[in-house]
């Protein structure tokens, strides 16, 4: 596991300072496609899901692990990618809907407009020209918010100057406020619901739950980015927008409890869980956005309120169970770690970071994408980091989901220009080094006794 983690970090470093971000479908590393799929009779330059097209849901997993690994200097190429496209993204909103804010779509060309194949060559004349005519991608606009949060986290972690990116963050937030007020005003007299909240309809919870009303992934994204940004720029405008963000939707799921029997029949128990959305019309893919409030948005997690709700979502949500996997961009290993589920995180990380099928062991894939699969490696890195170190406010939680029988030596970064180095051997923590020394008081060692 350690070797493959390190090899994949090396692969990320090979394009450390390129003007274009490391792509999820191979980065700089490509080889004859016949070794991946015999039907793809192309040159080694070919990669599935395009050369110039970026897919945000995949790209984010390449860049999230760079925070805890301390590779902050490698992140601007991804941030600048979106910053360069900002004006075209704003023009989309102006031209199509006559309102402010940047509309970044999920599959995006390097000039800020949708991939034409996904936009649709055979579109009905009456269809909204701002929408992709695509069952997977329609209304999926919230993925830009993960990169906004990454930018904010580079300031939290390393004190980075994020001034050049503030217009990107503000415009991305503005889009949701402007657009969903507009849509509500077209349906009726009021732009907000009875509680003064935005009505995020129609929306999309990843590519999976479509035509959503108040998707939990979008709500968690807006809430977290706004709360983080307000700490940077304490502006009344953003505080007012935060007050319009609805709560993360919850639901009860019936669970058959075989230990609670009455009259020889199983008595149902009801577990409160995170719902994918307040409502939706169909399921179109195999993602689990109801766990996005855990990661990347960290509303739920070890040491936080209502941890049991998130754990019950992981264990009992029927779609979360059906979609569970270690393959490709699947994030179950990350969620298990963030929820402190040591055995789950252990087994999923072993599967995720085991040797790939090629001579170079960190060439994973193709998964859902291509080989090498960089979002396979990125999600593996994130999960391993979360097993070792998490934060809750000012607390630094060590080994929140780490098997005590696994010996390890690590050095990772935490917010506040902090690094933590420690060794775990035979279940005992030794050689704990925290820089600056003043942060040592914030360390909470969570390894099982």
Please provide the spans of the model-predicted regions.
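Acidic/polar, glycine-enriched structural segments that form the non-catalytic walls/loops
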Residues: 1-52, 72-76, 82-93, 278-279, ...
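Mature extracytoplasmic enzyme cores
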Residues: 1-7, 11, 94-95, 110-126, ...
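Short, glycine/acidic-rich hinge or "gate" loops at secondary-structure transitions
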Residues: 19-30, 164, 182-197, 237
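Acidic/His metal-coordination segments adjacent to aromatic residues that form catalytic metal sites
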Residues: 28-49, 109-137, 198-215, 355-370
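Active-site core of glycosidic bond-cleaving carbohydrate-active enzymes
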Residues: 55-62, 67-91, 99-113, 130-157, ...
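Acidic/histidine-rich catalytic neighborhood
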Residues: 171, 175-232
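Catalytic cores of secreted or luminal carbohydrate-active enzymes
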Residues: 371-420
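Carbohydrate-binding surface patches
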Residues: 416-442
């Amino acid at each position: 596991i350690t070797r493959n983690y390190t090899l994949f970090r090396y692969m990320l470093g090979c394009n450390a300072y390129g003007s274009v971000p490391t792509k999820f479908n191979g980065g700089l590393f490509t080889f004859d496609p016949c070794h991946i799929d015999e039907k793809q009779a192309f040159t080694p330059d070919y990669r599935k899901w395009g050369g110039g097209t970026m897919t945000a849901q995949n790209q984010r997993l390449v860049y999230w692990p760079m925070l805890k690994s301390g590779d902050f200097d490698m992140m601007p190429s991804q941030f600048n990618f979106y910053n360069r496209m900002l004006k075209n993204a704003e023009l989309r909103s102006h031209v199509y809907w006559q309102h402010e804010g940047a509309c970044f779509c999920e599959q995006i060309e390097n000039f800020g407009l949708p991939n034409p194949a996904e936009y649709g060559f055979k579109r009905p004349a009456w269809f909204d020209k701002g929408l992709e005519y695509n069952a997977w991608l329609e209304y999926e606009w919230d993925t830009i918010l993960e990169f906004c949060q990454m930018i904010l986290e580079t300031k939290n972690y390393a004190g980075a100057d994020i001034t050049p990116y503030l217009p990107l963050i503000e415009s991305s937030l503005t889009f949701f406020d402007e657009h969903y007020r507009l849509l509500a005003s077209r349906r009726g007299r009021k732009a907000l619901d009875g509680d003064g909240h935005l009505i995020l309809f129609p929306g999309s919870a990843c590519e999976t739950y479509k035509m959503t009303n108040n998707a939990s992934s979008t709500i968690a994204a807006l809430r977290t980015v706004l709360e983080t940004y307000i700490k940077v720029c304490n502006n009344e405008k953003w505080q007012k927008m935060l007050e319009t963000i609805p709560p993360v939707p919850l639901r009860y799921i019936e669970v058959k409890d075989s230990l609670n029997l009455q009259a020889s029949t199983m008595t149902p128990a009801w577990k409160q869980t995170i719902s994918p959305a307040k409502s939706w019309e169909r399921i179109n893919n195999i993602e689990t956005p109801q766990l996005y409030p855990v990661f990347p948005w960290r509303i739920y997690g070890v040491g936080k309120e209502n941890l049991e709700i998130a754990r019950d979502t992981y264990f009992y949500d029927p779609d979360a169970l059906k979609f569970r996997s270690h393959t490709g961009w699947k994030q179950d290993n990350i969620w298990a770690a963030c929820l402190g589920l040591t055995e789950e995180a252990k087994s999923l990380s072993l599967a995720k970071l085991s040797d790939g099928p090629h001579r170079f062991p960190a060439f994973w894939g193709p998964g859902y994408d291509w080989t090498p699969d960089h979002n396979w490696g990125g999600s593996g890195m994130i999960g391993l980091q979360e097993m070792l170190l998490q934060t809750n406010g000012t607390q630094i939680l060590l080994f929140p989901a780490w098997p005590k029988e696994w010996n390890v030596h690590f050095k990772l970064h935490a917010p506040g220009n902090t690094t933590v180095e420690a060794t775990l051997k035979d279940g005992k923590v030794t050689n704990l080094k925290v820089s600056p020394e003043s942060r040592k008081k914030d360390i909470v060692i969570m390894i099982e006794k």
